[in-house]
A protein has these predicted regions:
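Metallocofactor- and cofactor-centric catalytic cores in central/energy metabolism, strongly enriched
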Residues: 11
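Hydrophobic alpha-helical transmembrane segments of integral membrane proteins
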Residues: 19-53, 105-121
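Internal alpha-helical transmembrane segments of multi-pass membrane proteins
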Residues: 21-32, 85-102
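Membrane-proximal helix-loop-helix units in multi-pass membrane proteins
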Residues: 36-92
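Hydrophobic core of alpha-helical transmembrane segments in multi-pass integral membrane proteins
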Residues: 70-79, 97-109
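Short, membrane-exposed interhelical loops at transmembrane-helix boundaries
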Residues: 116-135
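Membrane-interface capping segments at transmembrane-helix boundaries
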Residues: 148-159
Length: 159
């Protein structure tokens, strides 16, 4: 399900954005930004919880907070890009990034922390390794999505 949504997001941004660079470079840039906005930023606030995988009550709380924060991150990024798309100045990307990060910083303090009493079912080293594996798999997903999208768009422009 995430693959379909991410692919649609990547394709929609590529079509609407009127990208002027090589398709492979554009696809990797778009997927890199999407990875940062939709995975890295929410994970900083709510790192993967092993407890939420096996406890339905903890999962509901964790998923609600994570999805809410991800939606705020995505909407903030889209609205910032939309607002700055009409600006012709050179520093518009830096200004857009600053406004996005300010909005996310505000959301970081508004959203509650995810804390449960028994979040350490695993030893800390094992939990850190598991979180690293989850992060590596999500990074590989977004990288492969950008690579595949770039190859498909390159192939589509040649025919």
């Amino acid at each position: 399900m995430i693959g379909l949504g991410a692919g649609a997001l990547l394709g929609g941004i590529f079509l609407i954005g009127r990208v002027r660079t090589r398709p492979s470079k554009a696809a990797l840039m778009i997927s890199g930004i999407a990875w940062f906005v939709l995975y890295v930023i929410p994970t900083v606030k709510y790192p993967p919880s092993f407890e939420a995988m096996f406890n339905p009550e903890a999962a509901i709380t964790y998923q609600t907070l994570l999805v809410g924060y991800t939606v705020i991150s995505g909407i903030s990024a889209l609205s910032t890009i939309a607002a700055f798309s009409k600006v012709k100045k050179k520093g518009k990307m830096l200004a857009a990034a600053a406004i996005y990060l300010t909005a996310i910083a505000a959301a970081y303090f508004v959203f509650p922390d995810y804390t449960i009493e028994n979040d350490s079912l695993l030893p800390q080293q094992t939990l850190a390794a598991w979180r690293s594996a989850v992060s590596l798999s999500m990074t590989a997903f977004w990288l492969s999505l950008g690579t595949a999208g770039g190859l498909l768009w390159s192939y589509g422009t040649k025919s």
